Amino acid sequence: MAFTGDELARMLQFKDKMISSAGSALRFEKVVQEAMASGIVLQHITCIKVRICDNSDILSDRQLRCLLINGLYPFEGRMSMFGVTEEWEGASAAPERQVVFLLSSTGQVLGYEDGVIFYLSPTFSDFWTTAMEFSCQNAILSNFIAQKSRDEYSDQFQKYFTRMRHTPISLTGVLPRRFQKVESGACVEEDARASMRPIQSDSFGAKGPFCWPTEELLQPSAKKDVGGTVCMALSCQEDNSARHCTIYGLTKTPGIKIMLSRHTQTDRSEAMCDAATQTEDVVDNSSETLFLGGNLVHQSILETEVQATAKNTFDVSDPRIDSVYDTTVVGAMATDDVGCKHVQGGASLAQEKPLKGYCIIATPSECKPNIHWLKSPENAVHESAAVLR
């Protein structure tokens, strides 16, 4: 399902209103009713669609209605329903699966399915960028609900949230031979001329060179260190078929920076397609907002250094990189002060001037994670994480 730019802007507007009003139950419920009347559907980071509504717009059971009125220990106050995600089987009268999302008066987000309540996130804003798991690790069972104190529940929920948000991702790769560190000056010219071949990619639907090396590389010198020249291929799995995009850059230091983005509301297929066809896209790293073809996409940009290891391999492991569900490799940045003045051409997001000392060289093609609906994130790293080759 693709959304137009106006539809995305309207969805993001309601989403921001809900986040800002989450501290007041009455104001939050009013915004939910407005969104329900407008037919707002928001996309979670795990790619499921959350239809914004209250309990008057679903087939609710008695236990859910009591939960909304009386609240639930260990949470204080009443609950407010703000959305539901459903799985339908044909033209049946009732959904095959229905998960209701609730907001407590103290700000925590819970999930409700078939009489079982699951803790999901400590805040409403964190809910949209955190993977969901429905297991005994975060279930609040009515039979054992009074056997723990509020502090014990708080510790349990914090451990769950930390595990979901801070599962590190390791990306490893080996540089192609012609871009590995040159030991003797005799090999410099051969490697440099080999790198003059334009790098082709049909990731964006049109074949053409991403960028060319500078003439500086064509002057061999025994003192010149071209070990900082980096060429890598990033690939993402989608429907068991790899999509490739080559990233090429010139640096003075033996390393690059990977930029990772967390999409919180967008139709990724449409957004990446727009990014490929637009030439005036703007990346504002300070406001953590990315404009793709006129569609506003909220994201959090992380930069992590790629450390050189033995035998010209590179390894990335950064605890700031959250779970595999909300991380997509979208570009590469030069780590030195050369900026873009030594880079000609480039992909659609390449800038003519350095962006805060860095330069976006290229972006991969559509990077929609291959995720099964509401599945546990265990063993999912190899399915949807981008890998370096």
Swiss-Prot record:
Subunit and partners? Interacts with host MDM2; this interaction leads to the stabilization of host TP53.
Q: What name goes with this protein?
A: Apoptosis inhibitor U19
Q: What does this protein do?
A: Plays a role in the inhibition of host apoptosis to facilitate efficient viral replication. Promotes stabilization and inactivation of host TP53 through interaction with host MDM2.
Organism of this sequence: Human herpesvirus 6B
Q: Which family does it belong to?
A: Belongs to the beta-herpesvirinae UL38 protein family.
Where in the cell does this protein reside? Answer: Host cytoplasm; Host nucleus
By which gene is this protein encoded?
A: U19
The record's GO CC annotations read: host cell cytoplasm; host cell nucleus
Q: What is its main location?
A: host cell
| Protein biosynthesis recorded as keyword | no
Q: Identify the keywords attached in UniProt to this record, alphabetized.
A: Host cytoplasm, Host nucleus, Host-virus interaction, Modulation of host cell apoptosis by virus
GO biological process terms held by the UniProt record: symbiont-mediated perturbation of host apoptosis
- Where in the sequence is the signal peptide annotated? none
